[in-house]
């Protein structure tokens, strides 16, 4: 309780500065799932996919009996597809703005106005998602109000600040505009797929969450061949002159998230920021307490 009272939240500007300057590290969010309701998993996936991070991937580790209905797997594909349009829009806007502002110090009013318009569009996208989400229980309320609309409210504040700078004819630094565009790109850009360890004879069959996670983590960074054997399909490292069937993602950071949990905005940013502070070089794991849903 005393630590909670004394805790001071890292200002947003410090996060922006830390993750600027071509920050290129990645994070992989692993969601172990065992016979979960598809809608429960979908909310978890969305809360992870909307995390703001330079290189983000969300992997659903399905541990149901082999060959399930795959409703959970469809949820992660659905999220990836829905994010594609805003991600493309904001990536294009970022790149065009960077080219237009090359070698300039202050952003033109038209550029600031366009950035405000893009922040309004991003907020509207999230608000529409919340407005059309079917509310069935208190976790749906939490998802819509805290995950979707919470992020939208944050983006609305930036839109308001940009519009006020135009009204007051205030200088807006070029680097700040580019930071703001980078934030939009990171929020709406995420890779996603699923993995089922029970499809392979070479991965652990122990019936617990830890081994579900470890089965995937142990393969990260490997180039693998899918091989049919008398015991079933196995995954093995490729041999010299072989072409891999799978090149498994690797990343500097891994975040594990229960399939019935949700992340609030900035969660990944703030955890990684703490791990990268001077004096924390030997820190390997960081854990945060979580709260139950109201209701």
Regions found by a protein language model. Name each.
Residues 8-295:
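Internal catalytic domains of large membrane-associated glycosyltransferases
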Residues 1-4:
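Alpha-helical membrane-embedded segments
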């Amino acid at each position: 309780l005393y630590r909670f009272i004394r805790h001071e939240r890292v200002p947003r500007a410090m996060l922006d500065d830390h993750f600027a300057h071509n920050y290129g590290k990645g994070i992989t969010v692993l969601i172990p799932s065992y016979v979960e309701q598809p809608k429960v998993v979908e909310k978890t996936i969305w809360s992870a996919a909307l995390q703001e991070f330079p290189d983000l991937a969300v992997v659903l580790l399905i541990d149901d009996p082999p060959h399930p209905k795959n409703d959970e797997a469809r949820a992660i594909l659905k999220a990836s597809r829905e994010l594609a349009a805003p991600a493309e829009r904001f990536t294009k806007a970022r790149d065009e703005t960077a080219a237009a502002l090359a070698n300039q110090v202050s952003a033109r009013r038209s550029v600031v106005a366009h950035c405000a318009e893009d922040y309004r569009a991003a907020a509207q996208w999230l608000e529409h998602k919340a407005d059309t989400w079917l509310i069935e229980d208190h976790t749906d309320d939490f998802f819509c109000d805290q995950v979707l609309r919470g992020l939208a409210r944050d983006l609305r504040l930036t839109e308001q600040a940009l519009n006020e700078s135009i009204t007051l004819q205030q200088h807006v630094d070029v680097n700040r505009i580019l930071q703001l565009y980078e934030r939009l790109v990171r929020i709406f850009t995420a890779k996603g797929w699923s993995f089922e360890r029970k499809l392979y004879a070479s991965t652990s069959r122990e019936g617990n969450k830890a081994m579900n996670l470890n089965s995937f983590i142990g393969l990260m960074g490997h180039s693998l061949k899918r091989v049919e054997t008398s015991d079933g399909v196995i995954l093995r490292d490729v041999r010299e002159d072989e072409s891999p069937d799978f090149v498994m993602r690797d990343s500097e950071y891994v975040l594990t998230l229960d399939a019935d949990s949700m992340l609030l905005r900035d969660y990944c940013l703030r955890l990684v920021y703490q791990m990268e502070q001077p004096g924390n070089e030997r820190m390997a794991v960081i854990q945060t307490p979580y709260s139950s849903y109201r209701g």
